[in-house]
Amino acid sequence: MPPPLSPRARTLVGQVKRNVQFHVELHQYNTNPTPHTMADIQFDSALDLLRRLNPRDTKQNLQAITSIVPDLTEDLLSSVDQPLEIRRCPKTNRDYLLCDYNRDGDSYRSPWSNEFDPPLEDGTVPSERVRKLEVAANEAFDVYRELYYEGGVGSVYFWDLDDGFAGVILLKKGVTPGAKSSGEWDSIHVFEATDRARMSHYKLTSTVILHLANENEALGEMDLSGNMTRQMEVDLPVESDASHVANVGRLVEDMELKMRNLLQEVYFGKAKDVVGELRSKPLLCHGRTKAMDADKNTGLAPLSETNKEKAAHLEMIRSMQR
């Protein structure tokens, strides 16, 4: 049984249901979909809705959509990245992160004990070789987390493939919540390692989910939420199984550095410019008022905004004709 919906989620259910029904009716108007096509339509409509809704409410939005169309639950959970949740391992008393890659039914596998909580007798666990790599990777990224994040929670999960293995590196750091501020950073790095002669081919898909909120009586409320995904492929030399941990660590470190710089220089930089422009308009209006008052005192008529725009347009046309 799904958990009961909150009043906000129930309101969202109605909105999502109307949007999904609209998409379905639109496709039905143009085509005569088969049952398979109908499932694809609903899945695409759900993804389209999630892209348009506030990223900080992804969990509630997923809950609302899956309560309408339960058949989409598995596909949506495996396709949509959402903020990571923390659980404590009952055996080792250490925190670990939950995701679709360490889930089996309603149970989650701890990377520290390799056991499921709630207990699961026939849960899927990695082979002995891959489990050893998983343990080594958790130790390595635990150090990485302390050095780069100075706290937070991290977890690494590996699983077997026919021609190699795959894994996911999870990192979560939250801002210490104050009275009017909050924030979270979630990193999800999924990779595949294909074994070759003295080499390994790595495919890495990295996603960062960021939420920052601040409220101030003087400046008002600010909410920056979103996610960004980047991919890369590379061939690296492998001398032993330990080389995989070093290679994956280097790839994740480089990718996180690039994504941090991109967020800071492009996204935060653009947001800063927009906020600066909004804050400068009241000052500009105040300056214009003072200038007009000065013109009145000197007996000069101020140049209208229309004349200024015309003069700018004429100057632009002249520069293009040169």
Swiss-Prot record:
Primary residence: cytoplasm
Pfam family membership, one: F_actin_cap_B
Location in or out of the cell: Cytoplasm, Cytoskeleton, Actin patch; Cytoplasm, Cytoskeleton
GO molecular function, one term: actin filament binding
The entry's keywords: Actin capping, Actin-binding, Cytoplasm, Cytoskeleton
Entry's Gene Ontology BP terms: actin cortical patch organization; barbed-end actin filament capping; cell morphogenesis; filamentous growth; mating projection actin fusion focus assembly; mitotic actomyosin contractile ring assembly; mitotic actomyosin contractile ring contraction
Superkingdom of this protein's organism: Eukaryota
Record-linked PROSITE patterns: F_ACTIN_CAPPING_BETA
SUPFAM superfamilies, per the entry: Subunits of heterodimeric actin filament capping protein Capz (SSF90096)
InterPro entries, per the entry: CapZ_alpha/beta, CapZ_alpha/beta_2, CAPZB, CAPZB_N, F-actin_capping_bsu_CS
UniProt KW Cytoplasm keyword: yes
Gene Ontology cellular component annotations, sorted alphabetically: actin body; actin cortical patch; cellular bud neck contractile ring; cellular bud tip; F-actin capping protein complex; incipient cellular bud site; mating projection tip; medial cortex
Biological role stated in the UniProt entry: F-actin-capping proteins bind in a Ca(2+)-independent manner to the fast growing ends of actin filaments (barbed end) thereby blocking the exchange of subunits at these ends. Unlike other capping proteins (such as gelsolin and severin), these proteins do not sever actin filaments.
Quaternary structure and partners: Component of the F-actin capping complex, composed of a heterodimer of an alpha and a beta subunit.
Family classification: Belongs to the F-actin-capping protein beta subunit family.
Protein name: F-actin-capping protein subunit beta
